[in-house]
Amino acid sequence: MQLEVSDLFFSYDETDVLKSVSFCADRGERIAVLGPNGVGKSTLFRCLLGFLEPKRGSVKIAGRDVRDYSRRALAAELAYIPQSYSPAFDHTVLDSVLMGLSAQLGTFDRPSRAQAVRAMQILSELGIAQLAERGCTRISGGERQLMLLGRALMQNAHTLIMDEPTASLDYGNSFRVM
């Protein structure tokens, strides 16, 4: 799978945020997008995910425009960890990780026992299995960031897009994530 961004432009009102952004990324390749606050990194990620429509240019996965993907097909290709997350409901950490399957299963389908076991394995690997039954509004910012990583891993997409994934993490967890 190749992610290809070509001559991407995006503006908020009349303010250009992205100007002629182009790059390619192959499966397994790690790319860091660096820059000061407000430069457009999150906007770029939203364009990659098809959340925002660029003014000009294209985003393609394996030669196909992201706008041509169904939600389910795009979820198989891209998983996203936002830089901040304010949960609207107090789902458990385990349920929040299992939500990584919602694009594949459908909103109201229940995960299988094997999927729940896999979610617990992911929480264990991230060092937060003890939080599985805790409400996600009652965990720290760093624990919430690890939960979001778990959700993205549960999604099992080909490409992981992380927007400041270590901002809330301590040094040890930051090192493990990267």
Regions found by a protein language model. Give the residues of each.
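Conserved structural motif at the start of ABC-family nucleotide-binding domains
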Residues: 3-5, 18-20
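The feature captures the beta-strand-to-loop junction immediately N-terminal to the Walker
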Residues: 34-36
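Helix-to-loop junction immediately C-terminal to a conserved catalytic motif
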Residues: 49
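Conserved ABC transporter NBD signature motif
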Residues: 57-65, 74
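Conserved ABC ATPase "signature" region
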Residues: 98, 113-131, 156
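Conserved ABC ATPase signature
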Residues: 135-139, 143
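Catalytic Walker B motif of ABC-type/P-loop ATPase nucleotide-binding domains
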Residues: 160-164
